[in-house]
Amino acid sequence: MPRRRLPGLTILAALPFLAGCDLTAQQMPPSHPYFVFFAPDSAALDGAARTIVTDAAAYAKVYPLAPVTVTGYGDPAVGAADAARMARLRADALVKELTADGVDAKRIAVRPPAVGADVASSQAARRGDIVVGLLP
């Protein structure tokens, strides 16, 4: 009675095809930050900001298992409540643009508004951060 070798032969026949598979799209990427700057007292994305968000979305699509984290910043000089509100609006604008560019909203985590002494300058306080990959 002949032995059944079909499963083993099937696996051997598939090896040349599997050897050419590119698994990099499934691996976790190095953390990649993107910094988006806004006009004072604004959460509107200008052309340069949209380009940065589009670049972040493209990178996120290459690594579909990587988390995407968004943080909005606000200028503490305008008061804590107003700065927190602006930071949330900026984060929301980034999330909206990322999803419009094809990033699944379920992958995007929004960090609490960043307001306070850790924001060293008014320019730094007028930004939003997008990090694709694990946070450092």
Show the residue positions of the predicted features:
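Short beta-strand/turn micro-motifs at beta-sheet edges
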Residues: 23-27, 56-57, 119
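Periplasmic peptidoglycan-binding/anchoring modules of Gram-negative envelope and division proteins
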Residues: 42-71
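Short, charged, intrinsically disordered terminal tails
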Residues: 7-9, 23, 130-136
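Periplasmic OmpA-like peptidoglycan-binding domain that tethers envelope proteins to the cell wall
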Residues: 74-136
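A short small-residue
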Residues: 33-38, 72-76
